[in-house]
Amino acid sequence: MLKIKVLILLSLFFTNITWADEPYVSESLLNEIGEKYKILAKKRFLALQQTLDSVKGKSDLEKLEAVNNFFNEVRYASDMKVYGKKDYWATPWEFLGNDMGDCEDYVISKYFALKYLGVDYKKLFFTYVHSTKFDEPHMVLTYFETPKSEPLILDNYNRKIFPASQRKDLTPIYNFNGDILDEAGKGNEKSHKKWDELKLNMQRKKI
């Protein structure tokens, strides 16, 4: 009887462990990154893990600020310059490994880091906008506390997080969240090809 109780308690204990208890950057991945991108990249990933560890258990806003600040230190560069492609959605490992990327890459890396930290992915959206300042299409990560809340904007152009009403330089076009579409069984539509490719690359831990 005692043995059964112990097994039940252990089962409950391990059930309550979230995936955030596992490192975002595993030791094997860290070694692969070191081999491909060398020591400075390895240090960047160690710094990322330290940043994420420092805000575990804190509020969503503190997590947003920490993740936004960390990834905004990465240099901006076009997909053509980094990957020789016109439009490519890089994994966080590629983005931080190269230490450069375009607006989609900032959004992707912030999204998956926040998801790892336990921020509800249903509050996070890849948001296509038009930047009136630069007169070009752009992407930002938006956070909705509730479906009716004014979203917060996480952007690589303006490094501070502001409510959407304070970003007059951005004209919203539409919001996108591939995980929500996948959950609804709509994740394989041709219009979401970039997301499907990204999912595969994330599963493979493409660096």
Predicted regions and their residues:
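Sec-dependent signal peptide recognition
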Residues: L2-L9
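A structural boundary/capping signal
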Residues: T18-I207
